[in-house]
Amino acid sequence: MQNSTNMRILELLRFLYERTDENHPATVSDIIAHLNGKGIQAVRQTVYADTNALIDAGIDIVVVKSTQNQYFMGNRLFEYPELKMLTDAVASSKIISAKKSEELVQKLCRLTSTHQAEQLRQFASLSSRVKPDNEQVYYIIDAIQTAILEKRQIQFQYYEYTPEKKRVLKHGGYLYKLDPYALEWKNDHYY
């Protein structure tokens, strides 16, 4: 019995988190239909008790009281306008590849309801920014940040691309050694 109660409460929480927001609340009937569709038995009293248990546990579930109560997730880790700004930044960044941009937008979409996630995906797809193909940039940035934190030197070589898209070392292949102190993001570039 305890296991089925736990599963029901967890599925209720997942449903509220993924499917509801202030513009898309769920009624008790919606919740019961969802739970029954997942093979979890629920009645009105258990939904009321489970939502109250989640609220008592500190989960911000907003209850709109009426003849047919409606429920939705209140505060989330990020508010929708914050997610929109982050999505715009990822989608329009010329340092983040198209593939990585899509992955990051998908991760951001998991932080809100499916309704708002669909809007985020639409906004992200509107970006017409030219994106790089270099997937190594994330690891290079991470390595530099690690070197900064650990107060270690880095070494690198400059290169450029030919019209045939081949990498050619610049400055005779000179190996630069530096002590990095900070990385700064400015004008869509790291410095």
Residue ranges: model-predicted function:
Residues 1-89, 171:
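Short, basic/aromatic recognition patches that contact phosphate-bearing ligands
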Residues 1-27, 45, 108-134, 188-189:
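Short N-terminal signal/transit or membrane-insertion segments
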Residues 33-35, 43-46, 125-129, 163-166, ...:
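N-terminal start-of-chain detector that recognizes signal peptides
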Residues 79-165:
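Bulky hydrophobic/aromatic content
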Residues 145-191:
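Loop-centered beta-sheet repeat module
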